[in-house]
């Protein structure tokens, strides 16, 4: 070979898809947005279910945290076709955006994102349009309640079976809980707990039947609170303080070792692999931009 002769250039794009997937599967998902801009082929492979399957075989799966956010000025933009007033449910790899609204139009539609490929599909719509509904999941079913003004004892809650892909209304536990459109719900102790803001009562669903819950009202069901269950311990955030519920003593106990959270802005608790994630808003007065930490 002459000294002036150039060696043939071989790039990763010359490889077969299976080999490229094997390489991409070893790269952290935090780098996927940048890699997807390299070429259309990378973009397609990074959004494929085959990539997730390859990562699973290689033992390279990662936990990812998703935050519903309306701003378009973010690095990784995965926007729901519904608005931020939709209820969010997670069942397996799927993230469901339920209801919501566009301006004054309340929606009954349900959109499902496959977190493995970040692709959206439409699911069967609810029977009643709902905005800001309370959503809870249990045993592959999604419980949706409240979120509209024309509720009655027959339509206050509906349940979506993710296996049969069907909706059905659930009978109200008692006339005592019915009233208003605002409810809080949480999956706790293997069942669904529901609290009515207007009536200030709590019920739980057990083996298809409702019963009054003996949970202390002090700390449960306050508007604006955020709830999170980790290893069957229920945590609540209210007035920017985090507490946990002691079912034996029926009292809420302050969580020690955590400094007070900022007073100006919402706080959100979430389960991240049996660890609690705390999100709060930070307001910067200089340019009036809202930041999430």
Curated annotation (Swiss-Prot):
<protein>
    <recommendedName>
        <fullName>Putative F-box/kelch-repeat protein At4g34170</fullName>
    </recommendedName>
</protein>
<dbReference type="InterPro" id="IPR006652">
    <property type="entry name" value="Kelch_1"/>
</dbReference>
<dbReference type="InterPro" id="IPR001810">
    <property type="entry name" value="F-box_dom"/>
</dbReference>
<keyword id="KW-0677">Repeat</keyword>
<keyword id="KW-0880">Kelch repeat</keyword>
<feature type="repeat" description="Kelch 2">
    <location>
        <begin position="141"/>
        <end position="187"/>
    </location>
</feature>
<feature type="domain" description="F-box">
    <location>
        <begin position="9"/>
        <end position="55"/>
    </location>
</feature>
<dbReference type="Pfam" id="PF25210">
    <property type="entry name" value="Kelch_FKB95"/>
</dbReference>
<dbReference type="InterPro" id="IPR050354">
    <property type="entry name" value="F-box/kelch-repeat_ARATH"/>
</dbReference>
<feature type="repeat" description="Kelch 1">
    <location>
        <begin position="94"/>
        <end position="140"/>
    </location>
</feature>
<dbReference type="InterPro" id="IPR015915">
    <property type="entry name" value="Kelch-typ_b-propeller"/>
</dbReference>
<dbReference type="InterPro" id="IPR036047">
    <property type="entry name" value="F-box-like_dom_sf"/>
</dbReference>
<dbReference type="Pfam" id="PF00646">
    <property type="entry name" value="F-box"/>
</dbReference>
<feature type="repeat" description="Kelch 3">
    <location>
        <begin position="226"/>
        <end position="272"/>
    </location>
</feature>
């Amino acid at each position: 070979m002459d000294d002036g002769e150039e060696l043939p250039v071989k790039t990763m794009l010359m490889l077969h898809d299976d080999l490229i997937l094997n390489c991409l599967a070893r790269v952290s998902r935090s780098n996927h947005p940048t890699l997807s801009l390299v070429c259309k082929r990378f973009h397609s492979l990074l959004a494929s279910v085959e990539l997730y399957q390859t990562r699973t075989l290689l033992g390279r799966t990662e936990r990812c945290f998703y935050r519903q956010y309306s701003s378009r000025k973010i690095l990784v933009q995965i926007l729901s076709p519904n608005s931020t007033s939709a209820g969010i449910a997670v069942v397996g790899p799927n993230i469901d955006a339920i209801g919501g609204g566009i301006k004054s139009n309340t929606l009954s539609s349900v959109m499902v994102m496959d977190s493995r490929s970040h692709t959206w599909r439409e699911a069967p719509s609810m029977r009643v349009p709902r905005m800001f509904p309370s959503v809870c999941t249990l045993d592959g079913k999604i419980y949706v309640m409240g979120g509209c003004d024309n509720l009655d004892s027959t339509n206050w809650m509906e349940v979506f079976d993710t296996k049969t892909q069907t909706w059905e209304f659930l009978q109200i536990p008692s006339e005592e809980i019915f009233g208003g459109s605002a409810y809080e719900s949480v999956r706790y102790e293997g069942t669904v707990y529901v609290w009515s803001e207007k009536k200030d009562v709590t019920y739980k669903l057990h083996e298809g039947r409702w019963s009054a819950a003996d949970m202390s009202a002090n700390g449960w069901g306050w508007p604006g609170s955020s709830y999170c269950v980790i290893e069957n311990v229920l945590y609540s955030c209210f007035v920017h303080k985090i507490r946990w519920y002691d079912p034996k003593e029926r009292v809420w106990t302050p969580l020690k070792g955590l400094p007070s959270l900022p007073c100006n802005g919402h706080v959100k608790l979430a389960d991240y692999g049996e660890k609690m994630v705390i999100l709060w808003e930070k307001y910067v007065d200089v340019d009036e931009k809202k930041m999430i930490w």
